[in-house]
Regions:
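Acidic, metal-coordinating helix/loop segments flanking the phosphotransfer/catalytic sites
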Residues: 29-48
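Active-site residues of response regulator receiver
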Residues: 7, 52, 82
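Conserved nucleotide-binding and Mg2+-coordinating catalytic segments in signaling enzymes
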Residues: 136-155, 176-189
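Receiver (REC) domain active-site loop signature in two-component systems and cognate sites
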Residues: 55
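Charged docking surfaces used in two-component/phosphorelay signaling
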Residues: 14-22
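A Lys-centered signature of the CheY-like receiver
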Residues: 104
């Protein structure tokens, strides 16, 4: 699983990077917010990001907002690091889109556990997405034959007719009927 570590303090960044690498993650690093933004807004963003709040270029909170504004990409779990420790700061970070918040200084074990929590949440999200796709497919097809059901066919037909109208082309539709379908239905359900 890929994790981005973005921190402008070189000692902190290298310590976090080496710890995360030791825990079995693939690590990408960014020395400032601008570099982190390029990585996070790229076509294949990392699964998780550990972002420092105060960085040159784009700060961690603004970066959270920009990442969350993209609805079309896979979800990135964001852990925000900061020396800011007040309740208002934590709330501001979470409201900006961070999934978790760690106040500096922190123990490496705390980071390890929070990353493990993020990994668990991302795995659950993947399972939920797969289940949704399965349910969507089951709802669109006849269970016995595996063929598209009436509503799905009408929906596809509507899309194809709209596309043909936009492109100025025509569509052909074939209607097929199965003789003695009642016997098939009575036999197989």
């Amino acid at each position: 699983m890929k994790v981005l570590v973005a921190d402008d303090e070189i000692v902190s960044r290298r310590l976090i990077e080496s710890s995360i690498r030791r825990w079995g993650y693939e690590v990408l690093v960014a020395k400032d917010g601008t570099e982190a933004r390029q990585i996070l807004l790229a076509p294949d963003p990392p699964h998780m990001a550990v972002l420092d709040w105060l960085m040159p270029g784009v700060d961690g909170v603004e970066l959270c907002r920009q990442v969350r504004a993209r609805k079309d990409e896979a979800y990135t779990y964001i852990l925000l690091l900061s020396s800011k420790k007040t309740s208002d700061d934590v709330v501001a970070g979470l409201e900006a889109g961070a999934d978790d918040y760690i106040a500096k200084p922190f123990e490496p074990q705390e980071l390890k556990v929070r990353l493990r929590t993020g990994k668990r949440i991302l795995c659950l999200l993947d399972q939920l997405t797969a289940a949704r796709e399965t349910l969507r497919d089951l709802a669109a097809r006849d269970q016995l034959t595996g063929l598209w059901n009436h509503n799905s066919i009408l929906e596809m037909l509507e899309k194809e007719l709209a596309r043909a109208e936009r492109q100025g082309t025509s569509n052909g539709i074939v209607l097929a009927d199965l003789d003695h379908f009642k016997q098939v239905n009575d036999t197989f359900g």
